[in-house]
A protein has these predicted regions:
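Non-catalytic signal-transmission and effector/linker regions of two-component phosphorelay proteins
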Residues: 1-12, 18-19, 114-128
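Two-component/phosphorelay signaling modules centered on CheY-like receiver
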Residues: 18-36
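Acidic, metal-coordinating helix/loop segments flanking the phosphotransfer/catalytic sites
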Residues: 37-55
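Acidic catalytic/metal-coordinating carboxylates
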Residues: 39-40, 66-69
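Conserved phosphotransfer cores of two-component systems
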Residues: 48-51, 73-81, 101
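Active-site residues of response regulator receiver
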Residues: 59, 87
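Receiver (REC) domain active-site loop signature in two-component systems and cognate sites
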Residues: 62
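Alpha4 helix (beta4-alpha4-beta5 surface) of REC/receiver domains from two-component response regulators
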Residues: 69, 90-106, 111
Length: 128
């Protein structure tokens, strides 16, 4: 089991699928991190502008705004926020775009929880 540090890291999670949002929140909560979860990209960005999260985990396929668009807006309003992209489809072109735009990691939904937590921890460790 991956153990995440107990240091305070502000994590924002954005996914339009409430079941994924809930499961991912629980997973991060289970290792001691608090997550602010959002289903709406605009609300996510409003809060990010004032709270400047350390880490954002963003779904790519959403109805109102793609995760890539959210990532672009987030870079402008909170340039220090590290981004992890999460998606249901593994599209190499989208993966390249996300990584070229500064994503620290890219995961496919359904990834084994230990692998996901290790990626989140590595990203969080790179903040300091």
């Amino acid at each position: 089991m991956v153990t995440l540090s107990k240091e305070t890291v502000a994590v924002f999670l954005l996914d339009d699928d409430r079941s994924v949002l809930k499961a991912t929140s629980r997973l991060l909560d289970s290792v001691g991190w608090q997550v602010n979860a959002f289903t709406d990209p605009n609300t996510f960005l409003e809060h990010a502008a004032t709270d400047c999260p350390d880490l954002a985990i963003i779904d790519i396929l959403m109805p109102e705004m793609s995760g890539l668009e959210v990532q672009t807006h987030l870079r402008r309003i909170s340039p220090g926020t590290r981004v992890i992209m999460l998606t249901a489809r593994d599209d190499p072109a989208v993966r390249r775009m996300a990584m070229n735009a500064g994503a620290a990691a890219f995961f496919i939904k359904g990834v084994e929880s230990g692998e996901f937590l290790a990626g989140v921890k590595a990203t969080a460790d790179s903040i300091n």
